[in-house]
Amino acid sequence: MEEDSLYLGGEWQFNHFSKLTSSRPDAAFAEIQRTSLPEKSPLSCETRVDLCDDLAPVARQLAPREKLPLSNRRPAAVGAGLQNMGNTCYVNASLQCLTYTPPLANYMLSREHSQTCHRHKGCMLCTMQAHITRALHNPGHVIQPSQALAAGFHRGKQEDAHEFLMFTVDAMKKACLPGHKQVDHHSKDTTLIHQIFGGYWRSQIKCLHCHGISDTFDPYLDIALDIQAAQSVQQALEQLVKPEELNGENAYHCGVCLQRAPASKMLTLLTSAKVLILVLKRFSDVTGNKIAKNVQYPECLDMQPYMSQPNTGPLVYVLYAVLVHAGWSCHNGHYFSYVKAQEGQWYKMDDAEVTASSITSVLSQQAYVLFYIQKSEWERHSESVSRGREPRALGAEDTDRRATQGELKRDHPCLQAPELDEHLVERATQESTLDHWKFLQEQNKTKPEFNVRKVEGTLPPDVLVIHQSKYKCGMKNHHPEQQSSLLKLSSTTPTHQESMNTGTLASLRGRARRSKGKNKHSKRALLVCQ
């Protein structure tokens, strides 16, 4: 018997025994025997060899790959700007990045989900479908994001854009599931959202005493990068996959030879996502201070050096969106984004203001979140333009339609938010609130093998964590609730307080001027309690 397998709560673990040193025949498998196994292991000897090709060979496919839209449905030109409803720049910046994610946008525009969804009310996929459709089909205008998009998250003050982004992605992933309790962990990783944003980590530990190897695989939806000692994204990725020696006090407790022995540990990507979300760790978890350094990131990124099998040819990704935070700390500042439209032109999406930009400007930002897509995926989802279909540009007609000089044309049908059933917001809030999401994040905390981001109190000092929420406890103590707990869709002129954080109207020529001091009146402290 050469190897055995474990499936532990959404995590695949394999132990390879190239050399058995114990005289007891059952000693090598003591680690396995100490763990309660399911009645039937989801991986058999036949399916293990296909692990790299398909991590879920026997799990129920909730969203088969062939159901992903193969044809492009996105308009070639840039879409609408988003009205800031008061401290919602973090919502707008995140939504724009998701709106211009090609496979997600094409799926939403196909309306495939809403035609079969039996929930409708409280379904984040249905809500995002409505938003993306409105945003992409109304170029030159300003639209109000639906109140349901931030129900349960927005508290009337600025929040972290990355946390809202992952909150939304997680809510969409849950909307793909037919029943939360009836689906096993591994089947959840076959959803449409995981097919787009998800991949698998591989953590391999090799005992230097008996040469036993332990492989553990864990899913991810984003990758956090420590930038304190890195000058570029490539350097941060190299640090992430750098081999680590476990010895002395950090010696590995081997499940094969049952001894504490020196070992080598390596973290690599077993599978890489179609869409790669790279989060640059710019904020201190304790003080909230920002690492305001320039970190270089390329327009094209080769991820092959960081894969478990690095010698299989280039794996090229192209940049299509950048989420930026302007300010000196997480307590204040402003969020905006850059997106690449299907026509290939870059645009700065600053709340309601939409202006054309250049790749030079895009690459010179102090980025917070980077969005990359596999080059082959970008080309496939942009095939209609490459075949010669003339991209639609914003011309005089659009200029006449858009609001100008800071006056919001609220009677324009594009600006009127759809009527929301009061039960929709209530149910969405009940099903997915910020506190509940953070509680689930803590419950499903990444296993120590993948803690590659920060020091854990119960782990050796050189073990790091991939991603951990900045909000863990003391939320109410440090962030008292404000009077407005949800987005308010108002049909009147914004108040002075709202206008301080409200972008100007959509303008591809950038004629409108943004108000100064955005979000500086809404401070918040980020504190992690171990």
UniProtKB/Swiss-Prot annotation:
It catalyses: Thiol-dependent hydrolysis of ester, thioester, amide, peptide and isopeptide bonds formed by the C-terminal Gly of ubiquitin (a 76-residue protein attached to proteins as an intracellular targeting signal). The keyword Nucleotidyltransferase does not apply. Its EC number is 3.4.19.12. Coiled coil: none annotated. One of its GO terms (biological process) is proteolysis. Residues 496-505 have a biased composition (Polar residues). Its main location: nucleus. Residues 510-524 have a biased composition (Basic residues). The gene is USP17L12. Belongs to the peptidase C19 family. USP17 subfamily. GO terms for molecular function: cysteine-type deubiquitinase activity. Residues 382-412, 477-530 are annotated as: Disordered. Residues 80-375 form the USP domain. The active site is at C89 (nucleophile), H334 (proton acceptor). One of its GO terms (cellular component) is cytosol. InterPro entries: HABP4_PAIRBP1-bd, Papain-like_cys_pep_sf, Peptidase_C19, Peptidase_C19_UCH, USP_CS, USP_dom. Residues 382-392, 398-412 have a biased composition (Basic and acidic residues). PANTHER family: INACTIVE UBIQUITIN CARBOXYL-TERMINAL HYDROLASE 17-LIKE PROTEIN 4-RELATED, UBIQUITIN CARBOXYL-TERMINAL HYDROLASE. This is Ubiquitin carboxyl-terminal hydrolase 17-like protein 12. Deubiquitinating enzyme that removes conjugated ubiquitin from specific proteins to regulate different cellular processes that may include cell proliferation, progression through the cell cycle, apoptosis, cell migration, and the cellular response to viral infection. It is an enzyme of class 3 (hydrolase). It is found in: Nucleus; Endoplasmic reticulum. Residues 484-495 have a biased composition (Low complexity). Keywords: Endoplasmic reticulum, Hydrolase, Nucleus, Protease, Thiol protease, Ubl conjugation pathway.
